[in-house]
Amino acid sequence: MASDVSSHLLTVTQSRWTIHHMYNKLLILALFTPVILESIIYVSGPQGGNVTLVSNFTSNISARWFRWDGNDSHLICFYKRGEGLSTPYVGLSLSCAANQITIFNLTLNDSGRYGAEGFTRSGENETFLWYNLTVKPKPLETTTASNVTTIVTTTPTVIGTKSNVTGNASLAPQLRAVAGFLNQTPRENNTHLALGEGFVPTMTNPGLYASENYNGNYELTEAANTARTNSSDWVTLGTSASLLRSTETAVNPSNATTVTPQPVEYPAGEVQYQRTKTHYSWMLIIAIILIIFIIICLRAPQKVYDRWKDNKQYGQVFMTDTEL
């Protein structure tokens, strides 16, 4: 019984001594081993602005600041207990201190990883700080237009009879050209364009007739009708009414040039219908040929299969002469 108690006390004493021994070793390691702390700080700044990288170092500590370019590090600041020594990176402008550095005039190339190392008494206590700097691109500047030119076009004014025109008729040549050009065949268009003159179509006004010379003075609200016979004449305003002129001068109908249009063999609508009809006929022929081809392709394998089946079932039949 006594031996059991003594052995138990010895075991407890040994275990306590082991715990104290391990604690002492950890305490000794903690006192003589440098303490290293690492963290990452994310910082961003605008392009062209300034950014400050702040550390938790005190003013009586020495610090080294680095800029990492891939796997290479470049010393950009060395602050030794109140004495700042700056070694700027290429194109890098900054102010250096123990607890912070400020980078001026940020560019997109300044983005990257930076590091700060603080130490006292020859590296006895070291602290590492990592900075991930992101430079945001400068937004594009938009400028408003200060000088804006407004173009005002006046409409022509038509009063009185055919030969009297007042007001600014700057749009008249262009309107005549558009009205006469919309519903014409290519051959007729080429004829009129070769003359270099504007078109004056026959108007739907009941006061005008096909045999009457029309000098082109009409209102913008009237609709033009280009339907005419081969015997009808079109009258242009002569060479003075160019399409590129900004103003129009009223011309005496006696000075007008008469242009006889070329005869039209088929209306445009009928020609278009014939082309469509021919197009559909070709499609119908192609469809019939495809259907016949598909039927032949579907029946051919069936015939081959039937012939093979008959040969397999009955074999070949030979005609023999039994007479001697």
Swiss-Prot record:
Disulphide bonds in the chain: none
Coiled-coil zones: none
Expression triggers: Expressed at late times of infection.
GO BP terms, alphabetized: symbiont-mediated suppression of host pro-inflammatory cytokine signaling
Maturation and modification: Highly glycosylated.
Key words of the record: Glycoprotein, Host cell membrane, Host membrane, Membrane, Transmembrane, Transmembrane helix
Cellular compartments annotated: Host cell membrane
Name by which UniProt lists this protein: Membrane protein UL8
Organism: Human cytomegalovirus (strain AD169)
